[in-house]
């Protein structure tokens, strides 16, 4: 598993690589008309009447039976019919009349198209009847879910992103329980309800055993149809969702003639000629109700960013930056609708986001800025043999088959491969005279690769008042990493601006993770108003850790100090956990419900940063470093952490008021901390809890004016010496408040919005012995405002925006956390990442 001395060259690939998947997708899209023709059925029975005897019950089962008996092709998305009932069909009917009878009261209607029929929403359903899969693995009405569910529609997201708000920041604005977003590449610390979230694209997890926080550096918002959010601990989709689930649903093709969507945009603070970001995106979709597809490419190029004082924002050399960055997102999808409700959806994505410039942080000649001898500056002339970058390839196929032994069957198979490279980072030790100590110093950048694939199978059986959802998940993941070492003399002479690679060594031990799960979820409509639900998930996870020579010893060997070293033993560890949930939803009326639930989530915190640590002899013995003690599987295995949560909530949706409010309390018996010297994980046997309120309310004052607000009021604590103390600010979530006022009048819309994050403090770092070190920290809150707008033109739409309307100069939450993490041996100014100042955005989009 571990090959620490080998490394693939991580060179920038040309844009032509991005075009290859696009050309393939365009070829598939071009074949849609012929594929649709082959899939179409000739129907000649529209006017013929025949006898039917279809019982009342599941609408989807009734439609499938009707299609078989009538000999007609019915095309519909399973999300449309999930959870809906029919009164049945008995007697003599024609096709049109029979469909009308079956669909009565469902909010759906049938449309004759391409020799068959397709189902469409009549638009009469309330928001609470929206179908989502995030809460129960199969399409379910929000009104039946005992939990906090949010849906971010494409129009809401596009209003933000076309107005210039970056994706991570837009999510923090639109999802009440999600922390405000950082402005660099990382989304570390952007928690939900104070804990980590499971992020997915079309149901495929973006989380990995190695906790690299780049889940939102994964897709261009041009390709997002909607975002489904379930707040709080959940085991519905497996591990990692101790704070909630965010499922990013991508855009699909639409039936009909080929349709094109074009978008261009520009963003600038007008501080210098380099202060600009620009983007361009293009998609094509089309087909029939039987076969349809979409292909797209989105490209963005970023320049420099400046804060509210007119100074350039410091480049993030810890988790990497998005200044001087370019990204390409290529996506393609095909959707097939077969007879009797069967469907197949295929999706593919290639995403590449990385550094593309010649600027870097000047650390001073001989790294003098690291000693506080001179300020850190951003200068030209940067040349790195390894550049910060995220590259991801993902494929998935989803098949739906109704009437499989009386069940609905959902099958999904998927594959994800990603490579993540980091910025060159200085680990420099100085002598008493201020000279560099070469034996204890190095300049390096890591690369971390993950391959992830699996299969999900879900069966749904509906009776009159009871629905059973059960199935299995199979997941396989392989993680490997390495570290490029750069010539120390060259780096010192250039202030770190030139990184010439001379060796490659291991960074973390290799980790293979296998996970197999069985789950079952039941829902019972005890009355027309009361729905009870409950479920269990049994998950078995196997971690196989490779033997690993500690990174520090590999670096010493690369310097010629020794020729070999003992490996810290690897090994295997099995985890088996049972996770339960149960809840109740009571419908006060058609527009509102109250609910209560208990749920559990599970996570295995970053085994790569836990294992592979060791203490060696002070010097090599006959050229060999002798291991004295190490963190290994046999002697100090990492424990999984189970999070439990209780929640009470209320939601209300009608024509004027949309509101949702939940009170939650989550707790776990273990927690983790980060060693400030090594930045590695240490496990604590101390309890941790989060509790608070999450809510949102939007109200239409008139047909033109809307106001709204959302809030997360949260407190995060850990138990030290039988007392509840404040949790470390690097992991706790600050409370948050958002508000907006919007106006629209036909073709014009305006929105003024603000977000306020509140102060957060702790009592110091928690050490491995469970005690505080006495160095307390504080994160200062701040408030920023944006003005967004749009104007429909005779052809297309113009969107515009001003971010940070008041040009406030502030340090982001991540910038303040980074100073806590990294400033033990380096001046904090290097990690003082400010927010971007007043920035103007303009974009134009057109569909044709």
Q: Where in this protein do the model-derived segments appear?
A:
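Extracytoplasmic beta-strand/coil segments of soluble accessory domains associated
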Residues: 119-120, 168-205, 225
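Membrane-embedded beta-barrel scaffold of Gram-negative outer-membrane proteins
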Residues: 398, 408-426, 587, 593-599, ...
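Short acidic/polar hinge/loop motifs at secondary-structure boundaries
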Residues: 169, 189, 204-231, 282
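Gram-negative outer-membrane beta-barrel transporters
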Residues: 263, 525-532, 540-541, 656-677, ...
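Transmembrane beta-barrel wall of Gram-negative outer-membrane proteins
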Residues: 272-303, 307, 311-358, 391-402, ...
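A beta-strand signature from Gram-negative outer-membrane beta-barrel systems
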Residues: 219-263, 847
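C-terminal beta-signal and adjacent terminal beta-strands/loops
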Residues: 602, 756-765, 790-848
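Face-selective signature of the C-terminal outer-membrane beta-barrel domain
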Residues: 337-352, 388-554, 585-587, 657-663, ...
């Amino acid at each position: 598993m571990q090959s620490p001395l080998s490394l693939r060259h991580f060179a920038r690939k040309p844009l032509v690589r991005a075009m290859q998947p696009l050309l393939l997708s365009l070829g598939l899209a071009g074949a849609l008309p012929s594929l649709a023709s082959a899939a179409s059925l000739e129907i000649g029975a529209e006017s013929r009447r025949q006898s039917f005897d279809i019982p009342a019950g599941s609408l989807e089962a009734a439609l499938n039976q009707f299609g078989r008996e009538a000999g007609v092709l019915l095309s519909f998305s399973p999300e449309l019919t999930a959870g809906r009932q029919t009164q049945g069909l008995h007697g003599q009917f024609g096709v049109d009349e029979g469909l009308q009878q079956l669909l009565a009261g469902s909010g759906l209607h049938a449309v004759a198209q391409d020799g068959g029929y397709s189902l469409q929403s009549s638009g009469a359903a309330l928001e609470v009847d929206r179908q989502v899969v995030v809460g129960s693995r199969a399409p379910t009405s929000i009104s039946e879910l005992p939990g906090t569910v949010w849906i971010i529609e494409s129009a809401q997201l596009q209003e933000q992103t076309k107005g210039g708000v970056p994706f991570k920041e837009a999510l923090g604005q639109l999802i009440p329980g999600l922390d405000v977003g950082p402005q660099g590449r990382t989304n570390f610390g952007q928690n939900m309800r104070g804990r980590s979230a499971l992020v997915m694209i079309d149901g495929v997890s973006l989380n990995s055993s190695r906790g690299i926080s780049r889940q939102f550096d994964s897709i261009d918002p041009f390709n997002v149809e909607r975002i489904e959010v379930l707040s709080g601990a959940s085991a519905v989709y497996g591990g990692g969702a101790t704070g909630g689930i965010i499922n990013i649903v991508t855009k699909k093709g639409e039936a009909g003639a080929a349709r094109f969507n074009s978008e261009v945009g520009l963003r600038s603070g007008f501080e210098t000629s380099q202060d600009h970001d620009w983007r361009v995106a293009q998609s094509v979709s089309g087909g029939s109700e039987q076969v349809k597809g979409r292909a797209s490419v989105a490209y963005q190029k970023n320049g420099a960013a400046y804060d509210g004082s007119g100074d350039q924002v410091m480049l993030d050399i810890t988790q990497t930056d998005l200044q001087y960055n370019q990204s390409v997102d290529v996506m393609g999808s095909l959707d097939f609708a077969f007879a009797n409700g069967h469907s197949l959806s295929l999706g593919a994505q290639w995403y590449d986001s990385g550094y593309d410039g010649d600027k870097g942080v000047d650390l001073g000649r001989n790294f003098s800025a690291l000693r506080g001898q001179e300020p850190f500056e951003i200068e030209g002339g940067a040349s790195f043999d390894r550049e910060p970058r995220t590259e991801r390839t993902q494929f998935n196929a989803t098949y739906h088959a109704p009437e499989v032994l009386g069940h609905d069957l959902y099958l999904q198979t998927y594959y994800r491969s990603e490579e993540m490279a980091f910025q060159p980072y200085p680990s420099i030790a100085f002598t008493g005279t201020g000279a560099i100590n070469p034996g204890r110093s190095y300049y390096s950048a890591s690369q971390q690769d993950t391959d992830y694939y699996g299969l999900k199978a879900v069966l749904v059986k509906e009776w009159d008042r009871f629905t059973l959802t059960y199935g299995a998940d199979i997941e396989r993941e392989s993680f490997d990493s390495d570290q490029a070492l750069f010539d120390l003399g060259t780096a010192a002479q250039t202030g770190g601006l030139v990184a010439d690679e001379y060796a490659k060594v291991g960074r973390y031990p290799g980790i293979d993770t296998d996970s197999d799960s069985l789950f079952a979820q039941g829902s019972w409509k005890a009355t027309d108003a009361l729905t009870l639900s409950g479920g269990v998930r049994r998950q078995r996870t196997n971690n196989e850790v490779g033997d690993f020579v500690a990174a520090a010893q590999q670096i010493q060997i690369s310097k010629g100090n020794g020729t070999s070293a003992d490996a810290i033993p690897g090994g295997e560890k099995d985890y088996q956990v049972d996770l339960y949930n149960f809840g109740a939803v009571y419908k006060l009326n058609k527009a509102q419900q109250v609910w209560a639930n208990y749920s559990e989530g599970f996570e295995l915190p970053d085994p790569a940063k836990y294992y592979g640590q060791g203490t060696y002899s002070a010097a090599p013995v006959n050229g060999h470093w002798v291991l004295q003690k190490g963190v290994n599987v046999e002697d100090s295995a990492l424990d999984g952490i189970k999070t439990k949560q209780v929640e009470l909530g209320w939601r209300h949706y009608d024509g004027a008021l949309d509101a949702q409010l939940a009170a939650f309390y989550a707790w776990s018996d273990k927690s983790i901390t980060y060693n400030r010297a090594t930045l590695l994980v240490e496990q604590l046997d101390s309890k941790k809890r989060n509790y608070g309120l999450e809510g949102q309310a939007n109200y239409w004052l008139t047909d033109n004016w809307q106001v709204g607000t959302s809030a997360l009021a949260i407190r995060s604590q850990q138990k030290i010496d039988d007392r509840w103390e404040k949790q470390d600010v690097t992991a706790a979530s600050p409370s948050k408040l958002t508000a907006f006022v919007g106006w629209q009048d036909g073709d014009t819309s305006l929105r003024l919005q603000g977000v306020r994050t509140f102060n957060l403090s702790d009592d110091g770092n928690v050490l491995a012995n469970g005690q505080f070190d006495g160095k307390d920290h504080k994160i200062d809150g701040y408030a920023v405002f944006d003005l967004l707008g749009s104007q429909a033109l005779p052809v297309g739409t113009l969107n515009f925006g001003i971010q940070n309307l008041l040009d406030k100069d502030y340090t982001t939450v991540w910038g303040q956390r980074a100073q806590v993490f990294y400033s033990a041996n380096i001046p904090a100014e290097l990690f003082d990442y400010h927010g971007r100042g007043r920035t103007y955005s303009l974009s134009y989009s057109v569909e044709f």
